[in-house]
């Protein structure tokens, strides 16, 4: 993935901004895997989750971008055709940008609608996600309330438990079991990623490529990063993710002001203030939904 192909980019601010994407890529999965992981068998791939992780001098901030967010698709250069497509003021769900022209258009759309420059892009598919969780021996979670969801395969009791790859995927994909649907799901995704980072982001793992590479290697079949992102950058991202739940760290959903055409409409004033604080690497005082 080449960020230099993204046009009309915002100026860089202080700190580092990662766009972290979970896709529904089924690449390398057998029919048995798809059935076991409750992924379905849709062709192509779409974004199942999107987050911005800001790492700066005032602690990391993790912001979930609901896939049903109402956004404007701006002008862009086709990732394969090289042709420039003009912006026509067309509004759609955020995850449609990825479906239309992949990571480059998703980054372009996020930057256009937020004004925040993305420094690094990280994407992982279903099988890779489950593989990484299994590679570290599972992730311990404290689930406050029992829930079930046939679509994702989730069936959890309340309390502390260690989730394997299959269970972890079901946990982060569940939306229909919650009243808030996508907004509740993004909160669970944040909790899980923080727990995953707490177990993987230790100096013994991050600073030792012989330990870090096998851990990430379990997901390499479906791992996509921008061409300038190395192992050190991935390690820094894991450390920042770990810090989200401690000290000055903060996790939130993008501030929402209501709905439009069935999509979630961002609160423009709050988003503008949030982006300004991130650009200046100031403590985030804005709250999300």
Regions found by a protein language model. Name each.
Residues 1-289:
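Non-catalytic, solvent-exposed segments at the cell envelope interface
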């Amino acid at each position: 993935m080449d960020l230099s192909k993204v046009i009309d980019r915002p100026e860089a601010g202080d700190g580092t901004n990662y766009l972290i994407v979970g896709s529904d890529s089924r690449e390398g999965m057998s029919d048995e895997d798809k059935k076991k992981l409750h992924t379905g068998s849709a062709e192509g791939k779409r974004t199942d989750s999107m987050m911005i992780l800001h790492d700066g001098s005032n602690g990391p901030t993790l912001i979930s971008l609901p896939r049903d967010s109402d956004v404007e698709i701006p002008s862009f250069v086709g990732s394969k055709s090289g042709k420039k497509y003009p912006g026509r003021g067309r509004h759609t769900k955020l995850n449609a940008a990825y479906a239309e022209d992949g990571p480059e258009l998703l980054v372009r759309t996020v930057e256009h609608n937020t004004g925040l420059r993305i420094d690094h892009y990280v994407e992982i598919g279903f099988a890779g996600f489950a593989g990484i969780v299994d590679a570290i021996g599972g992730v311990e979670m404290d689930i406050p309330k029992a829930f079930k969801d046939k679509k994702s395969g989730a069936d959890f009791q309340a309390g502390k438990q260690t989730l394997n790859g299959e269970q972890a995927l079901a946990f982060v994909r569940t939306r229909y079991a919650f009243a808030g649907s996508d907004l509740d799901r993004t909160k669970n995704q944040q909790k899980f990623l923080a727990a995953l980072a707490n177990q993987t982001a230790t100096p013994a793992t991050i600073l030792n490529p012989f330990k870090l590479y096998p851990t990430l290697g379990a997901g390499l079949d479906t791992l996509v990063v921008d061409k300038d992102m190395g192992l050190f950058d991935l390690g820094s991202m894991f450390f920042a993710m770990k810090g989200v739940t401690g000290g000055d760290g903060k996790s939130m959903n993008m501030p929402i002001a209501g709905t439009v055409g069935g999509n979630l409409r961002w609160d423009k004033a709050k988003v503008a203030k949030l982006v300004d604080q991130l650009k200046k690497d100031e403590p985030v005082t804005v709250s999300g939904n």
